[in-house]
Amino acid sequence: MKKSKVIALLFVFITLLASCEKNGNILPENSLSVQNVKNSECRPNVKSSDDEETLRLVAKGDVLYIERVGVQNCSFKLEVNVSNEGNTIYVKELNASPIIASCFCCFDFSYEIKGMEPGKYVICVSGRREFKPLAFTYSTTLNKTYELEID
């Protein structure tokens, strides 16, 4: 009788364990780093609505390559700070230019976040404005463009 209860409990435990959704590894806090930060020159001939900002995510091994199109101050020079709490990634896009211009234009900018592992993530991007958090799944086949929504 005791043996059958142990076997039944073991069966239930294994079933529950197997049915859990796998989110991938949870990253250690602040284990990510940013590299290869670049931005284009002001693209004055590109017509872009102030509300049209996109984020393209591409996987390259443990590196998340990010391409952005966005509207910024004409003197914009990209600086990026990245941190994480578990699988929530916080990206702060800053203007490192000492020049303050009174105009705005469209820019292409990109950077890489190193230290990624396969799994489910939420990325929170902020800069000139705050955007709604974006959920995505990181895998070696990731290559997707998202429209960022203003929060």
Where are the model-predicted features located?
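A short tyrosine-centered beta-strand micro-motif
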Residues: 119-125
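C-terminal motif of bacterial Sec signal peptides marking the signal peptidase cleavage site
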Residues: 16-19
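Generic short beta-strand segments
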Residues: 67-69, 92-97, 128
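Primarily secretory-pathway and cell-envelope proteins
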Residues: 23-89, 132-151
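Bacterial N-terminal signal peptides that target proteins for export
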Residues: 1-7
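Surface-exposed coil/turn segments at beta-strand junctions on protein surfaces, enriched
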Residues: 59, 84, 102-106, 116-118, ...
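Short acidic/polar inter-strand loop motif in beta-rich domains
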Residues: 97-101, 128-135
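An anionic, turn-rich surface loop/hairpin at beta-sheet edges
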Residues: 92-114
